[in-house]
Amino acid sequence: FHGTEDALQQNVALEYERNGERYSFLKWAAQAFKNVRIVPPGAGILHQVNIEYIANVVTGREINGELCAIPDSLLGMDSHTTMVNGISVFGWGVGGLEGGTAMLGQPISMLIPDVVGCKLIGELGPASTPTDVALTATQMLRDHGVVQNFVEYCGPGLDEMSATNRATLGNMSPEYGATMGFSPIDTKT
């Protein structure tokens, strides 16, 4: 359904009608396993839901009597999971088997990738947008060759960008072939 005021409600109702049994199973799984969190249909697009509801930049936990800061990480079954990199969360997309394995508490393994720094300088001009920066960075990183690398953004230009704008950079990681496009933790995240 589209083009009407109640299109969202109609589409969500249709989703429940078509996938009710699956949603019942997922609801059970969320209660049965501590590492499974289910976001209901209609809550939004996955990579935006990750930022708004799931990802925590840092979690405090007491370990051996000391409070420790633990940076968050997130695996998603969507290539644009990397959007969370803009809020300083270490995350990327994986296949269904890897994602299911991780949800059940098993570790995933990967080769340690090369890390490529991308230094941003200057500020956005009045006629420029964060998307312009992301598209320019995408072209430059493609030309450099960063397939399966971690890209870390840095520099004074990054300092000028909001977390929302950094999320645009992270979201483009699949377009330049990197595993992720990470913005480090700072006062904006």
Residue map of PLM features:
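Fe-S-dependent hydro-lyases/dehydratases of central metabolism
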Residues: 1-189
